[in-house]
Amino acid sequence: MQPLPPTSQEAAIDLGLESFATLADGTRIHIPRCYRKAERALKTAQRRVSRRKTGSNRRRKAVKLLAKAHLKVKRQRQDFHHKVALQLVLLNDTLYHEELQTANMLKNHHLAKSIQDAGWSQFLSILSFKAACAGRSVVAVPPAYTSQTCSGCGVVKKGLSVRWHTCPDCGTSLHRDHNAALNIERLGQRLRGAVA
């Protein structure tokens, strides 16, 4: 990818499980759930491998089919990440995102499969690579309280289970992920200003 002309646009990205990403302008990018859609076929293929005798030709064939099914899911996810990252890089000069510790998040067994299916870590590395090639900047923001802090007045008064943010102090009312994206943008601009 060649360096791109400036667009004077910025985007803050809040990665999530309900929607893959929510931008500061309110745009929501829906998650394709590649693994979840293929899960039944993958389980069937895995069962076939388990039922075959070790070392047999039928088992080798079943293992190849299972690997092919997993590869298809991997490529679908990768294709989605490349398309979203390219779109964001083409439209924006600066991209802000949370500095997520996905390895720690995977310890939560209730969310691990969904987090793996979303592939946030892979997406962020693809985004950083494409941005560097295009001469764009990517700023990672500490994720502490981005979803809980009000983007209007800065008050922290809600738990993570609340999906709709309504501030009791200033009256700001919007989706929690949109609120988080606005906070990420504000923090990113502050960090970028301190570096520049």
Please provide the spans of the model-predicted regions.
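Positively charged, helix-rich recognition surfaces that bind polyanionic ligands
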Residues: M1-A196
